Amino acid sequence: SFIQFDSGQYLVDQGAMTKLYDFEFSMIGDPLVDIATMGMRNSYEPLGAPLPELVRYYEEATGEPVNHDAVVFHVLQFSLLGTMQFTGTVGKPCPGDPHSVYLMFDLALRRSILLALSHLTGDALPELRPLEQRTGDNAPLLAKLVDTLGTLPVTGEAAETHKAQVAELIEWVQRADDHGADMVARNIADVSALLGRGFERWIDAAEALEAYILKAGPEEDAALIAVLATIEGRRLQLFGPTALGEAARHVVLPATRFD
């Protein structure tokens, strides 16, 4: 079937859909991909009718039942592909990139990966203790930066949007200043416990964890999912409360059938 792949993007006028757009990823593939990506988008851009109702219409039109676990698999696949697509510029930003947008996508897609993995494997995501309230050492300097940006005169919608993106990045940095060092220390401790050796720097721990995962057998999946979910869960705790984290806070698996 011809699929849009990044589906669910419609132009609507007075309650009627007028156009589809964003077809650069379109291809021949499994039509359940479009149901999966429509469902992902539905969490923050509602489609209108409940998704289970739309799925029922699809089943009536095709005469075939939808494989609901296959939909979740495609959620996992799309989320993983998207994360890999942005990981380069998130880790090493390119001049002129929409940095705040990519951070938002990265955080939300990683959350989607974890939810899909948990559903498909049956491994529950770990419960994390709440972050303690604290203020980072650079709080006064960052407050000055926020104040300076707020008084910066700008003219035009494009300039206002750019200014808002800078404010979002500053808020992200503030959260990293408040809790980032503690998060890294906890992540290093978890990886050290799993691998049985200590690390001084997170980059060394992350590289060792990646090498371990590449060699691990399926019997270690549950333990690895728990570690990765803990690491990414802490990241969501850290940046979820920001403006850029709003999409990640609303990520849920597509509900493709009525309970």
Q: Positions of the model-derived regions?
A:
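Active-site acidic catalytic loop and adjacent metal/ATP-binding pocket
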Residues: 1-33
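Conserved NTP-binding catalytic cores of kinases and kinase-like/nucleotidyltransferase enzymes
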Residues: 15-18, 126-130, 173
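Short, solvent-exposed segments of well-ordered alpha helices
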Residues: 26, 45, 70, 74, ...
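Active-site activation/catalytic loop segments of kinase-like enzymes and analogous catalytic loops
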Residues: 32-66, 76-98, 104-119
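Charged/polar, low-hydrophobicity segments characteristic of intrinsically disordered regions
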Residues: 72-77, 107-127, 196-218
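Short beta-alpha connecting loops at secondary-structure transitions
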Residues: 97-102, 126-131, 153-154
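Charged, amphipathic alpha-helical linkers/stalks
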Residues: 119-144
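C-terminal amphipathic alpha-helical interaction region
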Residues: 136-168, 175-259
